Amino acid sequence: MTDIMKRAGLTHGGFYGHFASKDDLAAEITARVLGRSGWMERLTGTQKPSFSDLVRQYLSPRHRDDPGRGCLFAALGSDVVRQPRSVRRAFTEGLRLRVDALARLAPGRSAAARRQKSLATMAGLVGALILSRAVDDPKFSDEILEAAATSIGRS
């Protein structure tokens, strides 16, 4: 942060002065990053993808192989549990927004069924992405993505 502020001709103290604490800064960053998600734009835009297309896009080798531009839930999910309440609150709200948006695309005869499918889908997507990135065998990683996409994509 010091280097960034120095290049901008500012002090890092002045930057931090805009926040009550470093925890508040972390919560604000989390909320902003989650609010600018390309996935969320696809879920709420005028040309929504099909449920199965969305699952396939998320569980693609391209998404797996680009963690720096990928899903914040997969990147930070296991770490956020050790973060302050304000960061966890921002993370929770971001997840709720995605679950609600995904439920509008999910198959199901009732709102409750679509919400349940959405929750299970988010858990499966994030878990599969984490596992596919963690293993050191490319074929096994592809197999994880394919199995999850097939299973989750079923109505």
Please annotate each region the language model reported.
Residues 1-28:
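Helix-turn-helix
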Residues 28, 39-70:
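Hydrophobic alpha-helical connector segments
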Residues 31-37:
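Short, basic, alpha-helical segments at the C-terminal edge of helix-turn-helix-like DNA-binding modules
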Residues 37, 41, 62, 80-84, ...:
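Short amphipathic alpha-helical interaction patches enriched in hydrophobic/aromatic residues
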Residues 51-53, 65-92:
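Amphipathic alpha-helical segments used for helix-helix packing
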Residues 52, 96-103, 115:
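An amphipathic alpha-helix signature
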Residues 58-59, 73-77, 121-125:
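Short alpha-helical scaffolding segments that buttress acidic/His motifs in well-ordered protein cores
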Residues 85-92, 105-155:
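Hydrophobic/aromatic-rich alpha-helical bundle segments in the mid-to-C-terminal region
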